[in-house]
């Protein structure tokens, strides 16, 4: 017995909707799995950045005399009357430059040094 043309079309629509539902279920599962999964490459990058930050902090502590090896605090130098910006405004590289040269640059000179350092940085677009 032949089926009515409407029944054929209904069966095709039903089959198509079942396929679409199974496909959509698979598609919704994949993004969730991708979000949950962290790749080894990403972890390697995170660990590398963490180690770099840790080295930077250790270097800064060593320069300031606060490393774990030396428990004796550094004596503070007598004030010479020069103006020194707060440490929060200085980058670690700028602090290294200041301590390695042994002098305390004036405010204008600090701004110039910051501008030079930031212009060389890949992370800072510039002043």
From Swiss-Prot:
Gene: C12orf54
Pfam short name (any one): DUF4681
InterPro entries: DUF4681
Record-given protein name: Uncharacterized protein C12orf54
Source organism superkingdom: Eukaryota
Composition bias type Polar residues, residue spans: 16-26, 67-79, 113-127
Chain spans, region Disordered: 1-34, 64-127
Organism: Homo sapiens (Human)
């Amino acid at each position: 017995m032949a089926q009515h043309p409407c029944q054929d079309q209904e069966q095709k629509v039903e089959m198509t909707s079942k396929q679409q539902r199974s496909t959509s279920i698979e598609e919704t599962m994949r993004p969730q799995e991708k979000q949950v999964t962290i790749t080894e490459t990403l972890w390697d990058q995170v660990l590398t950045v963490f180690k770099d930050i840790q080295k930077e902090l250790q270097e800064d502590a060593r320069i300031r005399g606060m490393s774990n090896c030396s428990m004796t605090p550094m004596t503070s130098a007598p004030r010479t009357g020069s103006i020194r910006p707060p440490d929060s405004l200085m980058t670690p590289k700028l602090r290294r430059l200041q301590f390695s040269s042994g002098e305390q640059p004036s405010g204008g000179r600090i701004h110039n040094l910051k501008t030079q350092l930031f212009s060389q940085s890949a992370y800072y677009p510039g002043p």
